[in-house]
């Protein structure tokens, strides 16, 4: 009997394949996105050293206070603008976008477009 793999297993497998080709450097770090059922998380990572340079999530008090819900497209767009502003304050203007195996639609797309509008290049 052939068993069907879960969505999470398929997503993790896609992410591992992508990570073989994506790597963040000091000049162009990686913007990694993670989406759970209730929240979204974004980190800007320098993979050569293994350090997180900037991070933000919908759990942050200043972001959460402005939102009705933390798991919709509006929350993702707000997170994109916040992560872009934090990155620009640290002197990071270009990044490599790592969608984490998630489909580039909905919340992930909203976060990416908001980050681009706020000044990040990718």
UniProtKB/Swiss-Prot annotation:
Cellular component aspect of the GO annotation: cytoplasm; ribonucleoprotein complex; ribosome
Cysteine pairings via disulfide bonds: none
Signal peptide feature range: none
Keywords associated with the record: Ribonucleoprotein, Ribosomal protein, RNA-binding, rRNA-binding
InterPro entries, per database record: Ribosomal_uL18_bac-type, Ribosomal_uL18_bac/euk
Alphabetical list of SUPFAM superfamilies matching this protein: Translational machinery components
Matches recorded under Pfam families: Ribosomal_L18p (PF00861)
GO BP terms in the entry: translation
Listed GO MF terms: 5S rRNA binding; structural constituent of ribosome
Record function comment: This is one of the proteins that bind and probably mediate the attachment of the 5S RNA into the large ribosomal subunit, where it forms part of the central protuberance.
Family annotation (NCBIfam families): L18_bact (TIGR00060)
Assigned protein family: Belongs to the universal ribosomal protein uL18 family.
Subunit structure as annotated in this protein's UniProt entry: Part of the 50S ribosomal subunit; part of the 5S rRNA/L5/L18/L25 subcomplex. Contacts the 5S and 23S rRNAs.
Protein name (database record): Large ribosomal subunit protein uL18
Species whose genome carries this gene: Agathobacter rectalis (strain ATCC 33656 / DSM 3377 / JCM 17463 / KCTC 5835 / VPI 0990)
């Amino acid at each position: 009997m052939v068993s069907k793999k879960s969505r999470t297993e398929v997503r993790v497998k896609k992410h591992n394949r992508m990570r073989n080709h994506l790597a963040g450097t000091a000049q162009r770090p990686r913007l990694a996105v993670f989406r759970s059922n209730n929240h979204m998380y974004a980190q800007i990572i320098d993979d050569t050293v293994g350090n997180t340079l900037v991070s933000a999530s919908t759990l942050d008090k200043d972001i959460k206070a402005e939102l009705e819900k933390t798991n919709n497209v509006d929350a993702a767009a707000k997170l994109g603008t916040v992560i872009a502003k934090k990155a620009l304050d640290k002197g990071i203007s270009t990044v490599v976008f790592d969608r984490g195996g998630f489909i580039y639609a909905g919340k992930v797309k909203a976060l990416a477009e908001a980050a681009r509008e706020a000044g990040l290049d990718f």
